[in-house]
């Protein structure tokens, strides 16, 4: 499938996860890898948007080619691809506002 945003974005951020470390030739598992990398990716996306940049998440399948062409160690796996740049002038970015606290919470006294 052709994804023009991959070719036109001025920056591509590839986020890798590290499911295990290698210490003295032994695999040592890292716990909650997907959760940790997912949360960190969310912080990065929020910061990019706060800086006025546009991005979207892309998870090509398979992603092994990223591991190979970027020459990453065997214990790293591509997690997410973020094309980053300024939105084109004709792009319609949704004007999303937060709900007021009383709309989403219940207080108990």
Stretches found by the model and what they are:
Residues 17, 60, 86:
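Short secondary-structure boundary segments
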Residues 66-80:
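Short, electropositive alpha-helical surface patch
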Residues 4-7, 71-74, 97:
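Solvent-exposed alpha-helices and their adjacent loops that cap or buttress functional pockets
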Residues 77-109:
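C-terminal helix-cap and adjacent tail motif
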Residues 46-50:
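Short hydrophobic alpha-helices that are characteristic scaffold elements of the AMP-binding
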Residues 28, 32, 53-65:
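GST superfamily/GST-like fold recognition
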Residues 21-24, 63-67:
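Short, solvent-exposed loop/turn segments at secondary-structure junctions
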Residues 1-37:
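Glycine/small-residue-rich phosphate/adenosyl-binding loop
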């Amino acid at each position: 499938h052709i994804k023009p945003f991959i070719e036109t974005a001025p920056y591509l951020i590839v986020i890798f996860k590290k499911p295990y470390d290698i210490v003295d030739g032994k695999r040592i598992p890292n716990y909650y890898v997907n959760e940790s990398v997912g949360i960190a990716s969310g912080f990065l996306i929020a910061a990019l948007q706060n800086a006025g940049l546009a991005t979207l998440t892309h998870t090509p399948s398979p992603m092994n080619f990223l591991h190979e062409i970027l020459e990453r160690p065997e214990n790293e796996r591509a997690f997410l691809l973020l094309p980053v740049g300024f939105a084109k002038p004709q792009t319609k970015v949704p004007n999303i506002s937060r709900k007021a606290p009383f709309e989403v919470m219940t207080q108990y006294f």
